[in-house]
A protein has these predicted regions:
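Internal, well-ordered domain-core segments that constitute the primary functional module
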Residues: 83-156
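Positively charged, polyanion-binding regions of nucleic-acid-associated proteins
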Residues: 9-10, 72-93, 272-300
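A short, conserved structural fragment
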Residues: 40-42, 127-142, 237-245, 338-352
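Eukaryotic partner-binding/assembly regions in large regulatory complexes
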Residues: 1-67, 145-266
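Short amphipathic alpha-helical interaction segments
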Residues: 27-35, 113-132, 326-340
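Short acidic, hydrophobic short linear motifs in intrinsically disordered regions
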Residues: 4-21, 90-112, 203-219, 292-325
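C-terminal structured domain segments
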Residues: 289-362
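C-terminal engagement modules used by replication, chromatin/transcription, nuclear envelope/ESCRT
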Residues: 142-180, 337-377
Length: 377
């Protein structure tokens, strides 16, 4: 299912940006629509301008979200940008000041003050994200100048894609007041068929999460995985080259080396290398019982202790690192490593302690000892 792989790789496929790919996928939609609806409960949106597979997670997890955003306020600004664009026609132009005035009016009690540097920088991050997903185009000027001066102007154009950013809800969203309400509304019309709900939730979790971890011995998702292991693996292999690895308390879809669907770990960068080193060292500490695991193969550790260990592991491998990382110092690099591990869902932060998920025992690595000897010479 090459067309499905292409939809999984991207937020959407835009006809204007890649007409050949758009036509290829459009011709295959009929073939894959039934599969994604049955297995994942996903919709495929097809318009003359774009094709989008609505990828909804089985569970909302801490690391999910727009990686470019650094605050809740940026998500609020983004939603107001979408509302602003709703009133614009496709290819209609607008200036930056009209958008900033609109956003300022939407926030209550003067929360937004464009004279503040950090507030302007937040909006610039939002605008850059909007440009990256093509819901707006820059016709003249630059948003960068807005960081330095609130009176800076830029000319943008509405592409019309913004109306497809927010997913379709089956029920009135005005009745939704919490995350739990969203979860309930997702499968509201299917309550009579819990088997379908569970299957779609499991398939979504395998697709969008690094792994599925058993909550307890009666975890119904994990019971389903054990019963339908072969069918799940077969279905995912029909999408991409992979295997389902099932352990006592966790399960993973492991992609073949030549598969590049979605976000892949490890990436070819220094932080990924260091994360692998840390995961290998964590596994060693579990094996020698310095760290203990519970029945669900989860480990808890104080945050400061883990950071101390990471700094030590960085120092031991400093000779392998590019000069940029050597100059950053162990403390800053260790914080980056921790943030990266959280972003992949390898661990979660709970107040002042870290929850290390079972996947940390699944993968790991280290630098070549022989190379290190030669470097030291």
């Amino acid at each position: 299912m090459d067309a499905l792989q292409e939809l999984l790789k991207r937020k959407w496929i835009l006809r204007k940006e890649d007409p050949d790919l758009y036509n290829l996928v459009r011709d295959s939609v009929k073939e894959i629509r039934k599969f994604v609806q049955e297995k994942f409960g996903y919709m495929i949106i097809v318009t003359p301008y774009l094709i989008k597979l609505e990828k909804i997670p089985g569970y909302v997890e801490e690391w999910m979200g727009i990686q470019e955003f650094q605050s809740v306020q940026e998500y609020q600004m983004f939603c107001f940008v979408l509302l602003f664009l709703e009133s614009k026609e496709r290819e209609e132009q607008f200036v930056l000041s009209s958008l900033t005035e609109y956003i300022q009016m939407q926030f209550q009690d003067g929360v937004i003050d464009w004279t503040h540097f950090n507030t302007r920088r937040q909006l610039v991050r939002v605008l850059k994200y909007c440009l990256s997903i093509h819901i707006i185009e820059l016709d003249d000027g630059s948003e960068e100048g807005f960081i330095k001066n609130k009176d800076t102007e830029a000319l943008y154009e509405n592409t019309g894609y913004s109306r497809y950013v927010i997913r379709n809800f089956a029920h009135d969203i005005m009745d939704i007041h919490s995350l739990e309400d969203i979860k309930k509304s997702e499968w509201f019309s299917m309550e009579e068929d819990r088997g379908v709900v569970r299957r779609q939730r499991v398939y979504r979790r395998f697709l969008l999460s690094p792994g599925i971890y058993r909550k307890d011995k009666n975890d119904e998702d994990f019971v389903y995985i054990r019963h339908y292991y072969r069918q799940i693996e077969k279905d995912f292999q029909s999408i991409m080259p992979c295997n389902l690895h099932l352990h006592a308390s966790s399960g993973y879809i492991v992609l073949d080396e030549d598969c590049n669907v979605g976000t892949i770990f490890p990436s070819r960068n220094t932080i990924s290398d260091l994360v692998l080193v840390c995961m290998q060292q964590i596994t060693k500490k579990i094996k020698n019982r310095t760290l203990n695991v519970n029945d669900e193969e989860i480990t808890f550790i104080e945050k400061e202790l883990l950071l101390k260990w990471i700094r030590k592991w960085i120092k031991e491998n400093l000779v392998f690192l590019p000069k940029k990382y050597q100059d950053m110092g162990e403390s800053l690099v260790s914080e980056n490593i921790l943030a990266t591990m959280k972003s992949y869902g390898f661990l979660d932060e709970e107040e002042n302690r870290i929850k290390i998920n079972p996947i940390c025992g699944k993968i790991g690595g280290g630098f070549d000892v022989e190379v290190k000897k030669n470097v030291n010479k």
